[in-house]
Amino acid sequence: MRIILITGMSGSGKSVALNVLEDAGYYCVDNLPAQFIPELARYLADQGYTHLGVATDIRSRESLRKVPETITQLRKEHDVRMLFLTASTNALVQRYSETRRRHPLSIRNGRPDAGNPPSAAKGPDTSLIEAIEMERELLSPLADPAHRIDTSTLRTNALRAYIKEFISDEPHDITLMFESFGFKHGVPTDADLVFDVRSLPNPYYDTQLRPLTGRDQPVIDFLQSQPMVLAMAEDIRAYVEKWLPSFIADNRSYLTVAIGCTGGQHRSVYIAERLATYFRAHGNVLVRHRELAVDA
């Protein structure tokens, strides 16, 4: 059975991810304590199910410490992947302001008194920012072994498309994610390796190329005619290829390689696509253009 375990920050898009899994034919359960997942997997396997999606988060915080042990147990019999969704504090504050919902940890002890509504909880409430940072600290041990997605700048449609791509591949040793981004919008927090290509010739200064992207042929032709661009792409390729076996030996399931230029529209997009084309011959590869997804 393939099992996708979704966890991460409240408000980061876990419900969206779980809905994508459900649409793809997964049997999905929200807010299931980790210790119950193996029993559920056995039951569903006996019933003929082949795909299970489970979301567990801070609402089940008493069981969060058991997640690593549960993952180890499940991997003895199943293909298990773990997805960790996160977002910046500013992005989460804005989302909570828009929805007017309360953060699970904004109430004293993380939950109201038994039988009372949240507003009746005794003791002072934790501020939203304090609750977010508290949750981030509590969940931090789960981020490293998971594939992380920073949804700070992702629209819902872009996140849905990314999740679809994430679950579409077959089991393998490692997934390579090549992600383009613009430094003026911040470095992706889910990146394992970051390469700065801002020193390369910039198509932005050609008025005919400015509205295009690194996936458009005129921009590709321009960049491919620049020796510096080809040399930079080759050096990054060689670095990733040289050290990829070390990441695999470290039992990594995912490696996110972020390529950044100024705006994330031309140079980084082109190089990310070029690297993805090369490494597809070596295994499973995903591509994400962060700023293009935002502008889509």
Curated annotation (Swiss-Prot):
Keywords: ATP-binding, GTP-binding, Nucleotide-binding. Residues 99-124 are annotated as: Disordered. It comes from the Bacteria. Transmembrane segments: none annotated. The keyword DNA damage does not apply. GO terms for molecular function: ATP binding; GTP binding. ATP binds at G8, M9, S10, G11, S12, G13, K14, S15. The keyword 4Fe-4S does not apply. InterPro entries: P-loop_NTPase, RapZ-like, RapZ-like_N, RapZ_C. GTP binds at D57, I58, R59, S60. SUPFAM superfamilies: P-loop containing nucleoside triphosphate hydrolases. Belongs to the RapZ-like family. Displays ATPase and GTPase activities. PANTHER family: RNASE ADAPTER PROTEIN RAPZ. NCBIfam families: PRK05416.1 (NF003828). This is Nucleotide-binding protein RSc0403. It comes from Ralstonia nicotianae (strain ATCC BAA-1114 / GMI1000) (Ralstonia solanacearum).
